[in-house]
Swiss-Prot record:
It is an enzyme of class 3 (hydrolase). Represses a number of genes involved in the response to DNA damage (SOS response), including recA and lexA. In the presence of single-stranded DNA, RecA interacts with LexA causing an autocatalytic cleavage which disrupts the DNA-binding part of LexA, leading to derepression of the SOS regulon and eventually DNA repair. The record marks 126-127 as: Cleavage. This is LexA repressor. Disulfide bonds: none annotated. One of its GO terms (molecular function) is DNA binding. The keyword DNA damage applies. The gene is lexA. Residues 26-46 bind DNA.
Length: 241
């Protein structure tokens, strides 16, 4: 049986994974549970892992997968593929063959695997913005459960460490659903001033847009609405070991 705090934390992690595709940071967990220190979060996570509700992925800061939910959260067993919307997970996988330069993003079903081949359209900065994505580089197989039934999807290789507290490291491949709209808290691909692309957490404040890193070493950057164009929202993460 879980304590009240353990249940609250499990529900918070599960909802964030459903929404963003990545787990919350320890600071976000601490704030959500109204705790004074991160050590309390560490103890709660350890307890949830020991009871078989979550799994921490090795060699990765704050990479957490929810394995099952208790009956009180609508669980009762191991989590499978999502039914209404995606059940985001960190997928350990490999890269496909290189794509032809300049190819457009496309979806290619991978026979008998329950996966779809996405084009990796280039590299995205998780740090200081870099030049905008310009051409396809390779392909990657993405589980169909990670993709929504509507909208176009593409993949990008992450460069930089500004999103490490959101569980996104240098070298990861992020799966993006193409959209020009975002809600506060979404992790998005943002095109800054028409030529620099970056992966950040989105927040609108009046007529200004703030792009937040998930690493205290990087400052929050503020722009006017006409300086930032949302090009997609994070829906999943693929990691090669």
């Amino acid at each position: 049986m879980l304590t009240k705090k353990q249940l609250q934390l499990l529900e918070f992690i599960h909802k964030r994974l459903q929404k963003d595709g990545v787990p919350p940071s320890f600071d976000e967990m601490k704030t959500a549970l109204d705790l004074r220190s991160k050590s309390g979060i560490h103890r709660l996570i350890t307890a949830l892992e020991e009871r078989g509700f979550i799994r921490r992925l090795a060699h990765r800061a704050r990479a957490i997968e929810v394995i099952r939910l208790p009956d009180s959260l609508g669980g009762g067993g191991a989590l499978g593929a999502a039914s209404d919307g995606f059940q985001p997970k960190v997928i350990a996988g490999g890269r496909g063959d290189s794509a032809d330069g300049g190819a457009a993003a496309e979806l290619k079903p991978v026979a008998d695997t329950g996966a779809t081949e996405l084009t990796i359209m280039g590299r995205i900065a998780a740090g200081v913005p870099i030049e905008a994505i310009n051409q396809a580089a390779a392909h990657v197989a993405v589980p169909n459960a990670m993709l929504s039934s509507s909208g176009q999807h593409y993949a990008l290789e992450v460069r930089g460490d500004s999103m490490i507290d959101a569980g996104i490291n240098d070298g990861d491949v992020v799966v993006i659903r193409e959209t020009d709209a975002a809600d506060n808290g979404d992790i998005v691909v943002a095109l800054v001033e028409g030529h620099e692309a970056t992966l950040k957490r989105f927040e609108r404040k009046g007529r200004m847009i703030e792009l937040h890193a998930a690493n205290p070493a990087y400052p929050t950057r503020s722009y006017t609405e006409d300086q930032v164009k949302v090009q997609g929202r994070l829906v999943g993460l693929i990691r090669t070991y």
